[in-house]
Amino acid sequence: MATDSWALAVDEQEAAAESLSNLHLKEEKIKPDTNGAVVKTNANAEKTDEEEKEDRAAQSLLNKLIRSNLVDNTNQVEVLQRDPNSPLYSVKSFEELRLKPQLLQGVYAMGFNRPSKIQENALPLMLAEPPQNLIAQSQSGTGKTAAFVLAMLSQVEPANKYPQCLCLSPTYELALQTGKVIEQMGKFYPELKLAYAVRGNKLERGQKISEQIVIGTPGTVLDWCSKLKFIDPKKIKVFVLDEADVMIATQGHQDQSIRIQRMLPRNCQMLLFSATFEDSVWKFAQKVVPDPNVIKLKREEETLDTIKQYYVLCSSRDEKFQALCNLYGAITIAQAMIFCHTRKTASWLAAELSKEGHQVALLSGEMMVEQRAAVIERFREGKEKVLVTTNVCARGIDVEQVSVVINFDLPVDKDGNPDNETYLHRIGRTGRFGKRGLAVNMVDSKHSMNILNRIQEHFNKKIERLDTDDLDEIEKIAN
């Protein structure tokens, strides 16, 4: 199947990363290799964070690749039922769902011992008789893909050789990730087949598809349902729209998804998932899913209470680097993440730190998603102690050993104003899991001092000045 070659490519990518050791290089101009070590390249790297604005689909794929297990989600789940008078069920075991034996076997073979928080509440609604529509908010790593795959597999009649379940994903790569979950969970259903409705998958005009489940991107699925008539939309029993927040950020996907939904029968079960519930996503969800049950996560606010924040006054890039060296010389740092505004600065800094003997990994937006995943995995395993990055990984990466976050450049938006949300996500990489963290901000101009002051005002938290030429002062902050 298509997944095999793609998964193999990822394995090869990570195997290549394993075999590369840290490189000691004299050149300033570098680019990231698969293991985040540094190698020569041309100087065409002058891109700001805003220009390489984090691509939502790539970030979502990255989160899937780097998560080997479910995240321990402490958020409260809020269930808003379509019929407030009907009883509200949640389950604590998969046996309570009365699944077909082959499905239960598949669930356990995947390593799921009990339902995750989102699964506890979503599965009884999705597997109810008659099936109910659902809009659910869930981040990567909460088990939502397994939940909707279970719903699809529960409805499929393997003896019927035509599409019965349709799942829309924003990109080919995300479709393949969902496909892998279907193949794993459905492996005790040998007669169950899966088709990918993605660009490049050429079929003869007029051909009918015999696979019971189709996963694809909106444009190709729309063509297959309408123009090419490969799929009879009136026979679809379950329609899943995954990553809705990513979907509406992509030109044309929103309209295509709505057009597909309008072709489906009235009794088709509609399921929509999104990591966020901003107004644009909510409006889209209501167009696509009639009479829904809604599951929301009451998000616990990220807090700065466990993080000590400092700033260092510098007059140049070299002074900022020297301040960084002084920090490393005075205190023990398990692992650190250092954020830069441009790829060029990140590349230069990674090279300089490497020359000083540090084990450095480098992340930037020009890397393929699989390369980024390999770099993050190595950092998580402690093979590199310093991760230098642009905004590309400010979110979603939990590395327990990160004790220090350094803003080599303060985060600003495209207009040069403080990007408070990014600041919060950046320094939130430390002080995780209830531990105390340390954040150090480099300030090298009146403008960056103004940015820092505005960040202080926004969070109502004082950021103390730190003199990195005073070793005693540095040692105090570590206690």
From Swiss-Prot:
**Descriptive protein name:** ATP-dependent RNA helicase DDX19B
Q: Where is this region: C-terminal lobe?
A: 301-479
Q: What is its EC number?
A: 3.6.4.13
Leader sequence range is: none
Positions of the UniProt region annotated as Disordered: 34-54
PROSITE patterns associated with the record: HELICASE_ATP_BIND_1, HELICASE_CTER, Q_MOTIF
Any single GO molecular-function term of the entry would be: RNA helicase activity
Family from the record: Belongs to the DEAD box helicase family. DDX19/DBP5 subfamily.
**Motif DEAD box: residue span?**
242-245
Task: Give the domain note.
Answer: The N-terminal extension helix acts as an autoinhibitory domain, preventing ATP hydrolysis, unless the N-terminus of the protein is displaced by RNA binding, allowing cleft closure to bring key side chains into position for catalysis.
Q: Which GO terms describe its biological process?
A: mRNA export from nucleus; poly(A)+ mRNA export from nucleus
Catalytic activity of the protein:
ATP + H2O = ADP + phosphate + H(+)
Region feature N-terminal lobe, mapped onto this chain? 2-300
| Motif, Q motif: chain positions | 92-120
Query: What does the UniProt entry say about where the protein is found?
Result: Cytoplasm; Nucleus, Nucleoplasm
Variant or mutagenesis effect after changing D223R? Impairs interaction with NUP214 and RNA
Q: What does this protein do?
A: ATP-dependent RNA helicase involved in mRNA export from the nucleus. Rather than unwinding RNA duplexes, DDX19B functions as a remodeler of ribonucleoprotein particles, whereby proteins bound to nuclear mRNA are dissociated and replaced by cytoplasmic mRNA binding proteins.
Residue positions where N-acetylalanine is found in the record: A2
Alphabetical UniProt keywords: Acetylation, ATP-binding, Cytoplasm, Helicase, Hydrolase, Nucleotide-binding, Nucleus, RNA-binding
Q: How does it assemble?
A: Associates with the nuclear pore complex via interaction with NUP214. Interacts with NUP214 or RNA in a mutually exclusive manner.
